[in-house]
UniProtKB/Swiss-Prot annotation:
Disruption phenotype: Viable but females are sterile. Reduced adult lifespan. No morphological defects of the eye, wing, notum or leg. Eggs produced by mutant mothers fail to hatch and embryos display neural hyperplasia. Its main location: membrane. Residues 94-137 form the TM2 domain. It comes from Drosophila melanogaster (Fruit fly). It is found in: Membrane. Glycans are attached at N69, N75, N168. It is a multi-pass membrane protein. This is TM2 domain-containing protein biscotti.
Amino acid sequence: MFPVLLLLLFFFAKETHQINVDCNELQMMGQFMCPDPARGQIDPKTQQLAGCTREGRARVWCIAANEINCTETGNATFTREVPCKWTNGYHLDTTLLLSVFLGMFGVDRFYLGYPGIGLLKFCTLGGMFLGQLIDIVLIALQVVGPADGSAYVIPYYGAGIHIVRSDNTTYRLPRDDW
């Protein structure tokens, strides 16, 4: 009987310290997780976040770390805008297959929305097959994408490439060992 009372006392005496914060101010890694994996916010058709806009932003549900309570919702969940890749239905695997097997006729470029280059490849038999080979490499590296500016449909946790670009306005932070 005494061990049962001791166990009940320990169970009810446990204190929880809930911290109420504005969850939109959380910025450090480990304070929250976006998107909340329990909500299933990945669109199965596009393999991107549901509601991804043309500007590359999506509002998703996030979850705060343990013992953090959001003042907006009264629980540990909140919404936040996160970056995403807007897709318009062009699949990378379809484009690669078209480029490998029908690239000499320009079908891959017609599929991506480049009819002029597709017609040029058709008339020159893929640029004497050299243009076809170059297109296969450029499409595999995701340098050539759909003409409407969208991203390829790639599995959400797939081998997507994020290209980091710089121009004359890019500032490179000098390192100590230079």
